[in-house]
Structures are given as structure tokens and as C-alpha cells.
Amino acid sequence: PAASLAEVIARQRAMGWNVLEDTTVYLRRGGDSISLTGLSFDPALRHMRHDPDLPPADLSGAYRDVPDSLYNITAVHIPQLWGQIADAGYGDLTLAGHVHSMQMKLRLFGRAFSPAQLLYTRWSGRYDEGGRTLYINDGTGYVVFPMRLGTYPEITLITLRRCE
């Protein structure tokens, strides 16, 4: 997996993509700016990727010199880091994946249920807490079994609008 990930990243860079690995870039439009941070998935956490509580992550490099006054969007693979990101004062909007609703989701009476709830407090969709938002995308892939039951492939389009 590490070799294939390195190959994907190399191909993305060859296409001119700016791969955000523990780094922040700034998006400017007119006189406004927002910061966009990408956090790498630490290979040391691979064996803990389903644990609800992770050891403290070193976020200092990714957010170095990011002004607190700027709206920050953070992209991170595993949603369990959201608490640490928020506690550090970042991630006004955090985008995550990884869970895929464990490839099974049942919708009943306007609610969704999944085996993912057994492992994760936050496992799919939007969560708002303390003035910050986490969005967990169900993605398009699968793990182990090439199937998805009730967890439809998802690509999310988010439109940012200025507060008035």
C-alpha cells in the first residue's frame, strides 16, 4: 500500500497537482483569503486507524504561521483527528474520509444506521460542534469486500459563501 500511495502522489504531482502533505496553502479572491491545510496520514498510525482515540498528532508543521483570523479548511484522512485539530484552533471546516460507513448503511425513519457506529462517534456526514464543522465523506471505494450496501458512492461538492 505505501508503494502504491507513493505512486499515486507522484502521478498527481506529474499532473501539476499541489499535494498537501502537512502543509498549508492560501486561497485568495479579491481582498479575502482562506487557508487550506492537508494533513498526511502518519504510517505509524496505520495499526490504530480504527481506534476512537489517537495519540497526540504533531500539527505544528502543517499549521506553521497560519493566522488565527483566517478561515481554515483542513483535509485529513481519518476523522478521529478532528478533536485535536479543533483543540489547536484550526479546522473551521474539516473534510475527512476513511470510514466509508463500513460499506453498510441502513436508513430508517429519517435516520442512518451502520456498523461504523460501533467504532466511531462520528462516521458519516456533517457534524457541527463548537463553531467548527466536520464532514465525513463516504467515498467511492471499498476495503476487502467489493461491495457497498446502502452506502452509495459519494463525491461531495461544497460551495463556500462569504458571511454577510
Q: Language-model segments: which ranges?
A:
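Soluble catalytic domains of enzymes that build or remodel membrane lipids, polysaccharides, and related
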Residues: P1-E164
